[in-house]
């Protein structure tokens, strides 16, 4: 009978507690205090108020130290009675106040967890959750032992209400072995308010069968503990054992315990499955099982210890002892040596202490009611309980005392997960997945997506990803040839497969190795395989070797990995041919192993075969799956089995997922079907998926027995399948596993068909799995139906395979596998060993007995950092989705970074090492950023602070990331920050010498946090708004690579390289959709933004550049910028040939942001232009850095400029814009010379001189940031002015490779606008000599397009070398030339090609070095393929100077010197017949300003004709007199006016720079020159007054120009503003009149009527859009003089900016310029007229074609109808004949 004992009010000492008091229990790792006594229920089943831990009233663990006089105490019986009065134990307990494991109920554990934040790991509160491990454990305990019923307030109708009812009826019931971790993991019904009642077994059987062992054995155990620990601690350990929580996993019961319905994942006890009640019951009834009673008890106690370990290791008191180990050892999990590199994930979970504690538990495990049987049994019990509860007078069924008639199947109470829909109902012991669930992930972005249970997907259909799911991660050490291979098609991940099991097969079999077997006294039979292999020699440490080790125990978890010889302490010398003694390696890795028990295995095939079976027993590539057919109105098992024939909907489904095969003679996997006599049917369904064979047991294809309702022949097969598909026709009732009776069916996949047998047929899916099977993928999208397609088939088959793999991890199958493994090991240890010990030398080493033993030398520090396997650290990770901290293992291998939850033993995070972009280390914390800025947060465990340093070192070795930098950014007087940011958070351009630049921000940097807000959660617009509106802007950035390329995750990089725009988007952060939603920019229409059609046209010429840029091999080539995967660039290059590579990625990105102030994102067209311009600009910048970088920088600079999206070029171009005059003038030249001379001069001097001020130079210094040196000002609103700069960007096409991602994005930042805003000041600077300096750096960048050129960096360098003939000037011109080349080539290849030309042009360049535009021209000229480049270049120019670009860019910025020059209106691109003229025209904006893009155009069109004109323009622009004839020619060819700023910007700039510029005309020209230095060269100078070409080839333009002057630019010219220069250029190069970039303005002396000019301008604007297309059309050029042709091309390119911007500079220039400009206007008008006529003709042709197509379509339809009618008639005739026959 149950006895009651009064409990003192101050606390009750339970026998099991050993006198522990509630108050004595310390919080901490232990569970902490229990809930108030009033809430304690007998079995802890009673629901408890929030905040209180569930009472763990298990008899064993009942130290219900609740101070409640009203609560009855546990009865003192048997062992309990004797132990309870054990004073030492009581004292010990009180001292340590350690709650017994049993006490660690869910609630208590929850307290612990709260302490460690782990308890809530799964997001479930520890409070009275049914799954709480502690309570579960107790429930199991009570159930197994006494099955006593818990009563809420004591026994009904009994005074015992004031007493705590006893849980166990006899001492035997109290045995600790009964408290299984498994029990703990399962929620007990009592815990659930609505739970089913617990059942109690009456009679002696319950006490006798619980444990068939004498009590004496238990006392023996106690004595062992006492002998081991005579002090109070031993006592405490015992009490803890008695009270031990059945399972450590339970501790997280709320969080991830088995019963956790949230994750639906059972909490498993380490590797051992929790033992179901049934198992326990069996154990009771069959105690012997070949093990002595003592063994059984022993094992059960240790099992409990082991189970509690994982959960509350930290909280566990040192008193807990492991078998044979000191309590402290047992209390903590075993930690492997850090220098050991794990081969796979499960190896990281290997716990030697756990293996020792569980060594006896395997034999005790019993089969339990699992799978569908558990659900059906639960439903039967529920009905029985309900009826009995009713007879008990309304007592809560949870507390009724009823006898469980089927004691063997005493199931813990489980109510299911209340997750139902039309396909599936909630069911006890099962967990449902109905859509929207996603796998658990602790990363930051997951928190923003929602909790793990919230749908991640909502996709129309599941999408295949380059990333691996957490459950699919197995092998961590990946051979180089297999790392991140993207060539293989993406497929759904196969999950829960221990692929590491092939370690022995792949690395040992067939190679020299040694196997050792033995029986360890603590671990039982063990098997060790060890092998030494040579690695590549180390530069400093000589030969390198490593030891591969496999250590197998009874547990399924195996230790697999390797350790470097240098990382192993030994007394032997490292690196010798003989190697270290194997003993040293094993003792270091597994010090607890008794090495002396090992014996060498026999060298026979049997040993190898047995080891392979042992290791790979869990690997299977053959699966059998049942399919049940459920018709409308059906739901029961009998109904489904009795469906004799399949309906058409079912047949349709079967034909989709597999192939019907004839069984007779079938040779493949038959799944136990008869292939000889057809006894199991004649046909079956078979298929293969990812090398897995699947045979389906289809109910309608199996034999039907008319008189047998159970259809045993069918159920015999389907009932033994682990996974079953339930196919439901429309109208079928929801499925529930309660209707199925099978111990094996653990997973049901419900598929319902909609609109069967129609074209709109689709399927919906739901899954239900046994609660102890972990979740598996692929996740079902929320509210999604699948079309009938291969996508659905693959999804379903992957789900089926993963379902069976997951079910094998359930307790039932885990136990079976463990037993099998134990037998294998036992056989090997007993029958396959020799007598040779592992340390044979020790026997003869007698000297060691007397002489001093040689000390082992320490391992080389840090040697393991280069191991290929995963180095592991214990850390505490922040689970953002659940808001808790969890104990984890961090592993970093050569391929993966993974986090494993110690409690649930599952991977909770993984990413490729190539995906890591940076980290933020602190003294004890670490934030690791990956992908687009997502991150995980780690904290070192107590006393392991040095781990953070080791982790960072490992990240440096294995990843390409870098430490983050915190910056506080200031605003300028206009409120601008001075940089542009792309949609993916990378910085597109940085205003040179602006506050952001001074703070260290560089192009290519990646923003990961803005004002403490993670960028990964922001859209581009939100990013910009945050930057614009924050009072104090604090950012965390990840520096770019040395070449300026932004750091990106490898999938993002791969996507970009594929140049699929889609990929770009994939990499977009959750919030980071391309900022430019308008596709014009994204499409890379560039100028196409104003005219998408032209863009495509241009695309053809610019395609090469585009392709490269798109391919975005950033680092590898200038193309790199393109690599930014903006497939759009291809479009953009089309319109922007000159910026092909740069433009598309970098240019596009930048332009929109710059051009469009904050609105750049919103306006696609404008954005496109902006991007476009930025591209050239970037190119410019990049070339400049190239120079400054020298060979290295030339490459890096480009890469840097490009790589980041504008990289250096973008930076420089911006910078030039900012300091337009000097920058534009000098930089153009300087750049040219710098770029050109970068091979020779490398613009080192220029860098030094200008570099100081010039961001480019700086960028050189800091290659990472160099790309940012550009002058872009980030002010959010300044984007429009920057847009003009961006126009120069087109030269940066190389940069696009980086840009692809940022392309669209960069435009959005209002930064550019700011730049322009600051531009006025910059302009002034530009005017000053100093601009020259900046120019050089920017120039070099600008010239080559910097990053743009990156793709052709090497080419660029070559060009520079070629140009080197004119050392300073030539070098600069070269730089420009290369940039031009990039633009001209319109593809990185073009660039490369351009590089050949540049050599010729060097001389030209040298003469024209003064002109920034010249650089571009040079590119054109350089390319003897000028004609080929010339055509593209106009397009590019045009693209680079779209109207929007001009309008957006504030004139002031652009107007700086270079800008003013671009006054000449970009003529409509004339036929490229005259390459020089074309180039010239291109060089200048429509207004005649030199443009960077123009220079690109120049590349397309020969610049030779323009050389003189461009030269003049460049000279004037840069104010350098050094331009040589060659340079002049180059200048003419590639007018730098290509870069254009907004008219207003340019006008402002020009006004500032010079009076002439100030004039309205001057302002207009300024716009073109806004294009940046290059724009001056790029556009024909005809619009502008002739530049002072005369100038000395070397005079510097200004301070900045001085270095440039060295290059050959006249100092005097350095003063000239861009507009001025552009005017001058116009004189020098009449050819430039053709420039279509900006509308050229006539001189006042020209005698042109204003009205005529206005009309011309309007026409020009209109035509310009057309001309962009026509620019590509060389045919136009024939009509017009060569000069015109360039102009036209420029016009078309600049269509976006076509605003006729009168070039104020024109007035300044002699009438000649005006005349030239007038001529240019005439040419443009003529071109426009021609284009218009062509369009009209085309329209007529198209209309006629459309009419013809309509007629043909009508005719075809009629014919089709006639044919159908004939076929119908034939069919009728055929049918009639058939019937007649």
From Swiss-Prot:
Keywords tagged on the record: Acetylation, Cataract, Cell membrane, Chromosomal rearrangement, Coiled coil, GTPase activation, Membrane, Phosphoprotein
Basic and acidic residues compositional bias, start-end: 87-97, 1245-1261, 1509-1518, 1625-1635
Subcellular location: Apical cell membrane
Positions of modified residues (N6-acetyllysine): 1448
InterPro entries the record matches: PDZ, PDZ_sf, Rap/Ran-GAP_sf, Rap/Ran_GAP_dom, Rap1_Ran_GAP, SIPA1L_C
Listed Polar residues bias regions: 118-135, 1080-1111, 1157-1166, 1304-1322, 1425-1441, 1532-1547
Top-level taxonomic group: Eukaryota
Single annotated GO MF: GTPase activator activity
Segments of skewed composition (Low complexity): 54-73, 1196-1210, 1266-1281, 1599-1609
Membrane recorded as keyword: yes
UniProt-annotated stretches for the region Disordered: 45-166, 239-332, 1046-1112, 1124-1221, 1236-1565, 1583-1636, 1685-1712
Modified residues (Phosphoserine): 100, 146, 401, 1364, 1544, 1547, 1619, 1622, 1677
GO cellular component: apical part of cell; apical plasma membrane; cytoplasm; extracellular space; glutamatergic synapse; Golgi apparatus; nucleoplasm; plasma membrane
Modified residues (Phosphothreonine): 1387, 1699, 1703
Ranges of biased composition (kind: Basic residues): 137-146
Implicated disorder: A chromosomal translocation involving SIPA1L3 is found in a patient with bilateral severe ocular abnormalities including congenital cataracts, corneal clouding, iridocorneal and lenticular adhesions and microphthalmia. Chromosomal translocation t(2;19)(q37.3;q13.1). In addition to translocation, missense variant has been found in patient with bilateral congenital cataracts.
Official protein name in the record: Signal-induced proliferation-associated 1-like protein 3
Organism name: Homo sapiens (Human)
Higher taxonomy: Eukaryota, Metazoa, Chordata, Craniata, Vertebrata
Gene designation: SIPA1L3
């Amino acid at each position: 009978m149950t006895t009651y004992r009064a409990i003192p009010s101050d606390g009750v000492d339970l026998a099991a507690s050993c006198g522990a008091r509630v108050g004595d229990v310390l919080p901490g790792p232990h569970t902490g205090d229990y809930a108030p006594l009033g809430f304690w229920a007998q079995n802890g089943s009673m629901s408890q108020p929030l905040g209180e831990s569930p009472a763990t009233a298990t008899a064993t663990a009942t130290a219900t130290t609740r101070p409640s006089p009203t609560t009855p105490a546990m009865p003192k019986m048997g062992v309990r009675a004797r132990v309870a009065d054990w004073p030492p134990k009581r004292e010990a307990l009180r001292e340590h106040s350690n709650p017994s494991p049993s006490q660690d109920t869910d609630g208590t554990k929850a307290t612990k967890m709260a302490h460690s934040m782990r308890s809530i790991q799964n997001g479930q509160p520890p409070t009275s959750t049914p799954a709480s491990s502690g309570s579960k454990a107790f429930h199991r305990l009570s159930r197994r032992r006494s099955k006593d019923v818990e009563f809420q307030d004591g026994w009904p109708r009994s005074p015992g209400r004031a007493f705590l009812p006893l849980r166990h009826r006899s001492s035997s019931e109290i045995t600790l072995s009964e408290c299984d971790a498994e029990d703990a993991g399962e929620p007990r019904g009592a815990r659930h308010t609505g739970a089913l009642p617990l059942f109690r077994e009456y009679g002696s059987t319950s006490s006798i069968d619980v444990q068939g062992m004498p009590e004496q054995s238990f006392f023996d155990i106690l004595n062992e503990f006492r002998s081991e620990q005579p002090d109070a601690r031993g006592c405490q350990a015992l009490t803890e054992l008695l009270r031990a929580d059945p399972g450590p996993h339970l501790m997280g019961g709320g969080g991830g315990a088995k019963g956790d319905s949230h994750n639906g994942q059972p909490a498993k006890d380490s590797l051992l499955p929790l033992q179901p009640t049934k198992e326990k019951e069996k154990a009771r009834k069959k105690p012997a099982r070949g093990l002595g009673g003592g063994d059984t008890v022993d094992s059960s106690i240790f099992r409990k210890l082991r189970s509690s370990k994982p959960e509350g290791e930290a909280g566990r008191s040192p008193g807990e002892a492991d078998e044979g180990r000191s309590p402290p050892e047992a209390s903590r999990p075993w930690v492997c040596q850090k220098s050991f590199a794990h081969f796979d994930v499960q190896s990281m979970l290997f716990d030697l202490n756990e293996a020792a504690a569980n060594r006896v538990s395997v034999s005790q495990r019993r089969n339990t009611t699992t799978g569908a049987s558990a659900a059906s049994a639960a439903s039967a019990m529920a009905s029985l309980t309900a009826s009995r509860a009713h007879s008990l007078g309304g007592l809560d069924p949870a507390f009724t005392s009823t006898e469980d008639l089927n004691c063997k199947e005493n199931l813990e109470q489980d109510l299911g997960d209340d997750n139902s829909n039309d396909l599936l109902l909630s069911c006890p012991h099962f967990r449902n997945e109905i859509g929207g669930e996603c796998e658990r992930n602790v990363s930051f972005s997951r928190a923003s997506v929602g909790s793990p249970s919230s749908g991640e997907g909502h996709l129309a259909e599941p999408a295949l990803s380059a990333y691996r799911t957490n459950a699919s991660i197995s092998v961590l050490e990946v051979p180089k040839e297999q790392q991140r291979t993207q060539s293989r098609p993406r497929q759904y991940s196969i999950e829960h497969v221990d692929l590491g099991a092939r370690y022995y097969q792949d690395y040992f079999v067939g190679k020299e190795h040694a196997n050792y077997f033995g029986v360890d006294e603590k671990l039982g039979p063990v098997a060790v395989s060890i092998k030494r292999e040579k690695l590549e020699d180390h530069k400093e440490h000589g030969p390198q070797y490593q030891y591969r080790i496999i250590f197998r125990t009874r547990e399924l978890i195996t230790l697999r990995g390797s350790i470097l010889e240098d990382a192993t302490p030994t007394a032997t010398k490292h690196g010798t041919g003989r190697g270290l003694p194997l003993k040293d390696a094993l003792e270091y890795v597994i010090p607890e192993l008794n090495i002396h028990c090992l014996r060498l295995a026999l060298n026979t095939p049997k040993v190898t075969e047995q080891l392979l079976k042992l290791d790979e027993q869990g690997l299977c590539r053959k699966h059998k799956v049942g399919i049940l057919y459920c018709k409308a109105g059906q739901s029961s098992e009998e109904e489904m089995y009795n469906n004799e024939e399949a309906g058409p909907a079912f047949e349709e489904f079967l034909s989709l997922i597999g192939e019907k095969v004839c069984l007779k003679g079938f040779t493949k996997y038959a799944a136990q079907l008869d292939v000889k006599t057809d006894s199991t049917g004649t046909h079956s369904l078979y298929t293969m998926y990812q090398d897995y064979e699947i045979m389906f047991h289809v109910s309608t294809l199996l034999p039907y027995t008319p008189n047998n309702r159970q259809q045993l022949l069918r159920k015999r097969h389907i009932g033994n399948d682990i996974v079953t598909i339930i196919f439901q026709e429309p109208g079928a009732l929801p499925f529930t596993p309660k209707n199925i009776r099978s111990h094996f069916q653990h997973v049901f996949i419900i598929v319902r068909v909609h609109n069967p047998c129609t074209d709109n047929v689709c399927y919906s899916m739901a899954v239900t799995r046994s609660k102890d099977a972990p979740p598996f993928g692929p996740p079902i999208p929320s509210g999604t139906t699948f079309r009938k397609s291969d996508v659905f088939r693959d999804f379903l088959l992957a789900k089926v395979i993963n379902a069976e793999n997951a079910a094998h991890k359930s307790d039932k199958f885990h136990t079976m596998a463990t037993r099998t493994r134990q037998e294998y090991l036992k056989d090997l240890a007993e029958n396959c060993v020799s007598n040779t010990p592992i340390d044979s030398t020790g026997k003869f080493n007698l000297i060691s007995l007397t002489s001093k033993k040689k000390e082992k030398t320490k391992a080389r520090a840090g040697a393991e950092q280069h191991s290929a396997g995963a180095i592991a650290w214990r850390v505490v990770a922040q689970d953002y989705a659940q808001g808790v901290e969890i104990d984890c293992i961090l592993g970093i291998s050569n391929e993966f970074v993974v986090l494993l939850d110690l409690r649930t033993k599952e991977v909770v995070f993984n990413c490729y090492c190539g995906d890591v972009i940076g980290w933020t280390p602190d003294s004890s914390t670490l934030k690791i950023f990956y992908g687009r800025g997502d991150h995980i947060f780690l904290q070192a465990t107590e006393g392991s602070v040095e781990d953070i340093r080791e982790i960072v070192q490992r990240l440096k070795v294995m990843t390409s990331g870098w430490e983050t930098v915190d910056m506080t950014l200031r605003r300028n007087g206009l409120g601008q920050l001075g940089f542009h940011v792309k949609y993916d958070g990378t910085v597109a351009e940085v205003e040179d010498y602006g506050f952001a630049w001074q703070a260290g921000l560089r192009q290519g940097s990646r923003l990961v946090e803005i004002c403490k807000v993670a960028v990964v959660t922001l859209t581009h617009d939100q990013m910009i708004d945050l930057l614009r509106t924050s009072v104090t802007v604090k950012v965390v950035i990840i520096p770019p690579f040395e070449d300026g390329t932004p750091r990106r995750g490898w999938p993002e990089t791969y996507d970009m390289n594929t140049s699929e725009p889609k990929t770009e988007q994939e990499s977009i952060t959750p919030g980071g959709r391309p900022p430019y939603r308008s596709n014009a920019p994204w499409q890379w229409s560039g100028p196409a933004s104003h005219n998408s059609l032209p863009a495509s046209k241009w695309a053809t010429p610019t395609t090469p550049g585009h392709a490269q840029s798109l391919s975005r091999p950033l680092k590898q080539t200038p193309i790199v910028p393109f690599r930014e995967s903006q497939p759009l660039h291809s479009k953009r290059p089309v319109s922007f040939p000159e910026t092909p590579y740069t433009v598309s990625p970098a240019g596009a990105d930048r332009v929109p942001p710059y051009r469009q102030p904050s609105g750049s994102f919103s306006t696609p067209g404008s954005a496109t232009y902006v991007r476009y311009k930025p591209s050239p600009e970037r190119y410019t910048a990049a070339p400049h850095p190239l120079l400054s970088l020298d060979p290295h920088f030339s490459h890096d600079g480009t890469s840097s400029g490009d790589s980041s999206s504008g990289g250096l070029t973008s930076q420089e171009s911006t910078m030039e814009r900012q300091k337009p005059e000097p920058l534009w003038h000098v930089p153009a030249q300087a750049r040219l010379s710098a770029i050109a001379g970068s091979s020779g001069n490398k613009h080192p001097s220029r860098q030094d001189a200008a570099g100081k001020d010039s961001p480019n130079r700086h960028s050189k210094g800091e290659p990472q940031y160099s790309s940012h040196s550009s002058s872009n000002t980030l002010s959010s609103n300044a984007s429009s002015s920057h847009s003009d700069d961006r126009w120069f960007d087109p030269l940066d096409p190389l940069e696009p490779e980086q840009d692809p991602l940022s392309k669209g994005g960069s435009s959005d930042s209002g930064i550019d606008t700011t730049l322009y805003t600051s531009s006025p000041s910059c302009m002034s600077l530009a005017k000053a000599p100093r601009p020259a300096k900046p120019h050089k750096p920017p120039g070099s960048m600008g010239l080559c397009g910097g990053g743009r050129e990156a793709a052709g960096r090497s080419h660029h360098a070559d060009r520079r070398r070629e140009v080197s003939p004119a050392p300073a000037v030539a070098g600069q011109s070269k730089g420009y030339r290369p940039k031009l080349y990039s633009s001209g080539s319109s593809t990185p290849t073009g660039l490369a090609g351009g590089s050949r030309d540049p050599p010729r042009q060097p001389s030209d360049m040298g003469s024209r070095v003064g002109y920034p535009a010249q650089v571009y021209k040079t590119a054109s000229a350089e390319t003897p393929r000028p004609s080929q480049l010339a055509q593209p270049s106009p397009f590019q120019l045009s693209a680079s100077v779209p109207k929007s670009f001009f309008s957006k860019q504030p004139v002031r910025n652009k107007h700086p010197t270079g800008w003013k020059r671009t006054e000449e209106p970009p003529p409509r691109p004339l036929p490229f017949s005259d390459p020089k003229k074309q180039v010239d025209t291109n060089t200048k904006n429509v207004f005649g300003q030199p443009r960077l893009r123009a220079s690109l155009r120049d590349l397309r069109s020969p610049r030779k004709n323009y050389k003189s004109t461009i030269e003049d323009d460049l000279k004037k622009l840069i104010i350098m007199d050094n331009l040589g004839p060659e340079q002049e020619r180059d200048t003419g060819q590639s007018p730098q006016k290509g870069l254009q700023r907004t008219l207003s910007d340019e006008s402002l700039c020009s006004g500032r720079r010079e009076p002439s510029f100030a004039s309205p005309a001057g302002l207009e020209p300024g716009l073109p020159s806004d294009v940046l230095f290059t724009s001056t060269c790029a556009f024909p100078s005809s619009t502008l007054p002739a530049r002072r070409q005369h100038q000395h080839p070397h005079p510097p333009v200004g301070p900045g120009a001085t270095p440039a002057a060295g290059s050959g630019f006249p100092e005097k010219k350095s003063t000239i503003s861009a507009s001025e220069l552009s005017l001058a250029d116009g004189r020098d190069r009449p050819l430039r009149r053709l420039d279509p970039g900006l509308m050229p303005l006539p001189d006042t002396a020209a005698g042109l009527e204003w009205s005529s000019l206005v009309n011309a301008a309007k026409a020009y604007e209109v035509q310009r859009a057309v001309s962009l297309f026509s620019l590509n059309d060389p045919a136009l050029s024939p009509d017009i003089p060569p000069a015109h042709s360039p102009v036209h091309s420029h016009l078309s390119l600049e269509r976006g900016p076509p605003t006729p911007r009168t070039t104020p500079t024109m007035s300044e220039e002699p009438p000649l310029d005006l005349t030239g400009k007038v001529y240019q206007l005439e040419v443009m008008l003529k071109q426009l007229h021609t284009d218009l006529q062509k369009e009209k003709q085309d329209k007529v042709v198209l209309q006629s074609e459309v009419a013809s197509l309509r007629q043909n379509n009508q005719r075809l339809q009629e014919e089709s109808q006639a044919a159908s009618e004939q076929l119908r008639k034939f069919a009728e005739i055929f049918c009639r004949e058939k019937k007649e026959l």
